[in-house]
Regions:
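Predominant activation on well-ordered alpha-helical scaffold segments within soluble catalytic domains
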Residues: 20, 44-47, 67-70, 114-121
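Class I S-adenosyl-L-methionine
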Residues: 1-56
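Class I SAM-dependent methyltransferase SAM-binding "motif I" and its flanking Rossmann-like core
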Residues: 25, 38-100
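Pocket-edge structural micro-motifs
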Residues: 33, 88, 133
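A contiguous loop/helix-start segment that scaffolds small-molecule binding in enzyme catalytic cores
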Residues: 8, 24-29, 98-148
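A short acidic, often aromatic-flanked loop/helix-cap motif at beta-alpha or helix-coil junctions
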Residues: 1-6, 92-94, 137-139
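Structural motif corresponding to alpha-helix initiation and N-cap regions
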Residues: 13-16, 91-92, 113
Length: 148
């Protein structure tokens, strides 16, 4: 994914154009996505465009990756009134999560995983986080601590 907003918008427009063309042919179209289509999903941007053009577009809920990751680890995301913060680690925002009270799920950590590890070490909490870079995929890997 590019950080260039113009390029992203152009890509979303092109996807909506392609879907619209298929719908105009009377075809039924499915846009399958991993996780939930309403949580940091490319699909949401395409959905808005397709719906704005007057097409019927249905959202089918999925399992967000942070929920799938917690289940794979056998952990609760939060308990006893703890706050849960879902933070995208993109765009240099990784440091926001660990500073908040409660629990944090950092999403999209691929390019910032070393930054997250450094932040946790600075806070004296290097073993307090787990990483599932391939949650939901065949052969998903679980790193119980970010020190791995």
């Amino acid at each position: 994914m590019t950080q260039d907003k113009q390029a992203r918008n152009a890509s979303h427009d092109a996807a909506a154009d392609a879907l619209g063309a298929l719908l105009d042919e009377g075809k039924t179209v499915v846009f399958l996505t991993l996780g939930a289509p309403t949580v940091y999903s490319t699909y949401w941007y395409v959905h808005k465009r397709v719906a704005a053009r007057g097409y019927a577009a249905e959202l089918v809920p999925g399992v967000p990756s942070f929920c799938a990751a917690a289940a794979a680890m056998g952990r609760a995301l939060c308990e006893d009134g703890e706050m849960l913060h879902i933070i995208p680690a993109t765009h240099g925002r990784a440091e926001e999560g660990p500073a908040l009270p409660g629990r944090t799920a950092l999403m999209k950590t691929g390019k910032s995983v070393l930054e997250v590890r450094h932040l946790l070490r600075q806070r004296g909490e290097p073993g307090s986080a787990a990483l599932l870079p391939t949650v939901g995929y065949d052969g998903q890997r679980l790193h119980k601590h970010t020190t791995e």
